[in-house]
Amino acid sequence: MAELISREGNKVEFKVAVPAAEVNRAYEQVWAGLARDVRVPGFRPGKAPRKVIEGRVGKGYVEQEVRDRLLQVHYPQAARELKLSLVDATIDPQDLNNGKDFTFNVRGETYPEVTLGDWSDLKLEATSPEITDDVLNRTLSDLQERNATFESVDRAIEASDQVTIEEQGEDGGTYPVYLDVAEAHVRDALLGKNKGDTVEITVPAHQHGDHEHAEHTVTVKIMDVKTKQLQELNDEFASSLNFESLDRLRADLRNELQRRAQQEGDNARREEFVAHLTERMQADIPQALLERRREAMMQEIQDDLSRQGVKWSEYETFMKEQGKLDEFMADLSKNAETRVKRDLALEKLAEDLKVQVSDAEFNQTMTMLAQANGLSPEQLSKQLGPNGINSYYASIVRERALQQALAQLSGPQAETVAADQGEQQAEGQEESAEKSEE
């Protein structure tokens, strides 16, 4: 049960009491998981006494697992019960005891008051690209190119050939060069040459990563020359791609292109509508909210660099040396503001449209998301944490509000929310929740 204690401006405080029965159930679930996962010498899996398991993992660990499980469920539920859209929150849990109620206090900030302009008569102008015969034929040509074969020839190198070269020198290697996509200085040096020729390639000064490379010369030997062989567009070509005929390949390809075009048009109309909302909304956005989102986005960038083996300090130094750091930071702040405004507009839209997502619907979506990521619902909940779960719920509400509004609008093409668009939303929800959590 949730009780609102105070609300001043966008700052709120509320108290949540979890019944003893729910606490007992959480304890049982945690003990069941520990009995399954903790291996104790001398006992079969699941047969070790709780006291023995507690001795191995510690009483504090058990209590923390129970506390986390309760918060992951009851904090988001309380926020929904009180109809609070929280930007951020601090949770203060009280003592936890089996067989007794568990209480916790929450202090947080809600989104600021927002007023949206009238959008009911908006005519969306974005359209889906037209799939003409020319578009289809170009796509078929691309398929031919991707499935081309190469045969060795005894003649001078031509513009569409594949050339195998051996770089001379201690660090040299052998590798293929596709002239139709090669850089100009490589292509120009090789055109007209023959197998067995030794060629000097002048590489212009360039920058690679954070290193500057002066102009230099590379000596290579031409080991082989191959000409590109395109398969004829016929039933045999279609069969090589597991289609029964060329007509069937063309039909399936057109359907796929039309599906992508429809999706592109839908996405364009979504962005057009959101841009309309944010441009005309009125809201006093606290600077702290913008700064918090900017910091969250900066953390995302640092995490991404870290996964690539790059330290932020190194990247920052590189940006300074290039004179681009100020521009980078300005763009980051601008993008943070755009994200905040988008969320605020869609939160208000959901409120105006009285959009609701039931606990059953939300739990089903969480289960589907967990399965898509190879996790159990419990693992996903733990990974997201209480704030992340709340943000994930908010993202679902925002998406539903956007779909509902678009369905009401008329334009060059009426909005229909495709099933595959919903699947895309599910794939991106976890990342969205993690970003929104900040």
UniProtKB/Swiss-Prot annotation:
Protein's cellular compartments: Cytoplasm
Bias (Low complexity): 418-427
Gene3D superfamilies in the record: 3.10.50.40, Trigger factor ribosome-binding domain, Trigger factor, C-terminal domain
Region (Disordered): 407-438
Keyword match Cell cycle: yes
GO molecular function: peptidyl-prolyl cis-trans isomerase activity; protein folding chaperone; ribosome binding
Keywords: Cell cycle, Cell division, Chaperone, Cytoplasm, Isomerase, Rotamase
Subcellular location, principal: cytoplasm
UniProt-listed Pfam families: Trigger_C, Trigger_N
Any one Gene Ontology BP term: chaperone-mediated protein folding
PANTHER family tied to this protein: TRIGGER FACTOR CHAPERONE AND PEPTIDYL-PROLYL CIS/TRANS ISOMERASE, TRIGGER FACTOR-LIKE PROTEIN TIG, CHLOROPLASTIC
Function: Involved in protein export. Acts as a chaperone by maintaining the newly synthesized protein in an open conformation. Functions as a peptidyl-prolyl cis-trans isomerase.
UniProt-listed NCBIfam families: tig (TIGR00115)
Protein name (database record): Trigger factor
Provenance organism: Deinococcus deserti (strain DSM 17065 / CIP 109153 / LMG 22923 / VCD115)
